[in-house]
Amino acid sequence: MTPMMRQYHEAKEACGDALLFFRMGDFYELFLDDAKVAAGILGLTLTSRDKDSENPTAMAGFPHHQLDQYLQKLIRAGFRAAVCEQVEDPKAAKGLVRREITRVVSAGTLTDEGLLDPKEPNYLAAVFAPSQKAREKAQKEAAKTNDPSGGDVVGIAWAELSSGRFEAGVFPRARLDDELARIGPAEVLHCEDDASVHPDPTATWSWTARPAWSYAAADAEKSLCKQLSVANLEGLGFEDNGDVAIRAAGAVLCYLKETQRGSLDHFRSLTCHNRSPVLQIDAATRRSLEITRTMRTGSREGALLGVIDRTVTPMGSRMLADHLAAPLIDADAITYRTDAVDEFVRNNNLRSDIRTVLGDTYDLTRLLARVATGRTGPRDLRQIAVTLSGLPALKARLAERDSACLTRLESELHLCPELREQLESALNDECPLSAADGNFIREGFDSELDTLRELARGGKRWIAEYQQRQMDETGIANLKVGYNRVFGYYLEVSNAHKDKIPADFIRKQTLKNCERYITPELKEYEEKVLAADEKASSREQMLFTLLRENTHKHLAILQEVANAIAMTDVVASLAEVAAQHHWVRPTLTDDSVLRIEGGRHPVLDVTMAQGEFVPNDCIQSPETGMILLITGPNMAGKSTYIRQVALITLLAQTGSFVPATSAEIGIADRIFARVGASDELSRGQSTFMVEMVETARILNTATSRSLVILDEIGRGTSTYDGLSLAWAITEHLHEQIGARTLFATHYHELAALQETLPRVANLSVAVKEWQDEVVFLHRIVPGSADKSYGIQVARLAGIPVEVNERAKDVLAQLEADHRDSLDRPTIAPPSGVNGKGSGDTYQLTLFGYADHPLIQEIETVDIDSMSPIQAWQFLQEAKAKLSAGPKAVKG
């Protein structure tokens, strides 16, 4: 085995299951099984070393500048990659170049700009569940204190390497999936020994099993204290069951240190999520309401986030997504945000000026993360300088504002004048990504560098003049001076002119069509030029290191600046939407009243032409009705109406204005939406089972302060079963929970509940019939609907005319209530079709035989008390009744 392959195997052993990208000169190479895997995933050519040997070594590679491109493909395919770099200059190396693994890249540990979506956060999360013994103990304690979690909790921590954000919290185990859906991590760590956490293979994030020692309590606390520079963790707010959150946070930090092999100085605080309660939204509701992603395509476009995101900075866009994923439930905190939005709505010029300034800033959050982890380059530092240059104008426009939020943001925009001046004077306007590319320090910044550069440039001019002089003296017109790393500078002469070579030319290399020479004079100047070049490069690298270190010293204050820029952008974005689309400021209350006048669906309000969307009111109170039963035909707008109420509530609690003419909203603690039909085939659950599971969660966890949205509950089973369930669910919500509820249903029978339940009110969607056509008015009116108009909707959907006409015929026969001898509805076959049964009719058994009067008579007869003759007579009578039809039976 060669020394290089021995070095490779040592690195491979250290990186575990990650594919190893091994730097060799200008290429990254993969060997053995890694090469075979990568060739298939990345489309690389699979070749081999030592092809003539008995066991050639499989290999594949790519140019070093394509690293980001191939890392991205690999991560998307679910793999991890270890990057092994050359950590010394090959020219200075004595023997084998020293190499080290500088980082391990996984879905949750991306920092490079080319690997990240600028508008999306990229979280690494960890889950920790206590042991069975600890769980049982906690459950006993919870029983004594009436803890709603029952003591069955998990710790979840999440961090973003590209920003330094770090949070953790304690959550009921039942909410694990919901919380992960809220966070939206790219990768989730779980303890390989914990059988109680079941990684969901259908999740949008990847799962990584970690050893139990990485969750050790003592190590977690020690590591976190050191990282955060605190003596203990008591001041962070992790109290009841807080150890599970601490252990999850420790696992995150352990993984980051293991994979990054460098500084994590931008992780300066750990936020206790439980200190700031937020509106609870389960995973199903997030999907149903399409808050951040559409259900059909999974994209931002068409979702609520997509239409309200008018941010002009990447960090503002990410913060807005965070706010929308976790709306507030504290009235003061909501008002704090809304006041700032209000001030921007009222001042168009101010808002426009601020958005213009923000548009010239770069992604400071992620730039600082690369500074902290030691992966920054000259272009990053230049972009930090440009961002700092815009701060004075931004700070001036935020000065002396009425809003407490804007006042605080102005105070957090630290100008850092010394750092800004240094970076601006040091760096060229156009800088390379990597410091190794050189030529990024501005002329005049460093006199020593300027001298070395001038010397190098002067030497190169001399070489050009020397070439011309040799051409003139020798008469060789095509003589040229060249350079390579082996021979340095040389004179190249074609074979046709070899006879003209002067005596002082020393031959160094013979090629097919030419020969290469050196001269003492040429070598002397070469040493001067190369020495000046190398010294200039070394000086420039040293200056870059100083700039990077000085920027690193400002890390904490610059992170505060980045957050202030992002929040300013979020507030201005919400104000921009409100001003453009005439949204209004909602009034937030702590009671259960919901009063929306002229409400509009926020997505449709923005995407449809102005005036096209039909606004509707929604009033919920103990006096007018807390449960609104909405009936009406499909396509009339029932689902849109109930969704818009939920989204308006969510926007209000985010701190946004809302699409309405006025809105008074009692703050909700939870929003539930059981909307739409979908199955979970991968989990073995039918559409109806999914519907019932989601409904059960609502009934078990909703409170009187919750907002519940139900759409067509019970349609996945038989008519009577579905109606019975819908009826009982409505009663339970009314009697046991008292939550504000909007229930869109096709069961018109539910309208009768208004007569018996005082807080139930009927609404319907207005339609107009004209010449066998149905016109949907999309207007919500009091009262229940009396028709479903399903056949008309089917025609609008493109159902063939003959099918539609046959449906009308069948409907007419069903409404006429024709029945056979067993009391089953009968349908005559279409003309030209011969029936199979007696009387050429179809018998429908929608409700089974159990309701037939003859069956009921047989069930009640006492056979044991009958004589054989009496039994025979009963049978004869039953047969006669059966032949005579249902009326004879009833008579």
UniProtKB/Swiss-Prot annotation:
Sorted UniProt keywords: ATP-binding, DNA damage, DNA repair, DNA-binding, Nucleotide-binding
Biological process per Gene Ontology, one example term: mismatch repair
InterPro entries membership: DNA_mismatch_repair_MutS, DNA_mismatch_repair_MutS-lik_N, DNA_mismatch_repair_MutS/MSH, DNA_mismatch_repair_MutS_C, DNA_mismatch_repair_MutS_clamp, DNA_mismatch_repair_MutS_core, DNA_mismatch_repair_MutS_N, DNA_mismatch_repair_MutS_sf
Lineage top rank: taxon: Bacteria
SUPFAM superfamilies reported for this sequence: DNA repair protein MutS, domain I, DNA repair protein MutS, domain II, DNA repair protein MutS, domain III, P-loop containing nucleoside triphosphate hydrolases
Binding site for ATP: 632-639
GO cellular component: cytosol
One Pfam family hit: MutS_II
GO MF annotation terms: ATP binding; ATP-dependent DNA damage sensor activity; damaged DNA binding; mismatched DNA binding
CDD domains to which the protein is assigned, alphabetical: ABC_MutS1
PROSITE patterns named in the record: DNA_MISMATCH_REPAIR_2 (PS00486)
Presence of keyword Lipoprotein: no
Functional summary from the UniProt entry: This protein is involved in the repair of mismatches in DNA. It is possible that it carries out the mismatch recognition step. This protein has a weak ATPase activity.
PANTHER family linked to this entry: DNA MISMATCH REPAIR PROTEIN MSH1, MITOCHONDRIAL (PTHR11361:SF34), DNA MISMATCH REPAIR PROTEIN MUTS FAMILY MEMBER (PTHR11361)
Protein family (similarity comment): Belongs to the DNA mismatch repair MutS family.
Protein name: DNA mismatch repair protein MutS
Species of origin: Rhodopirellula baltica (strain DSM 10527 / NCIMB 13988 / SH1)
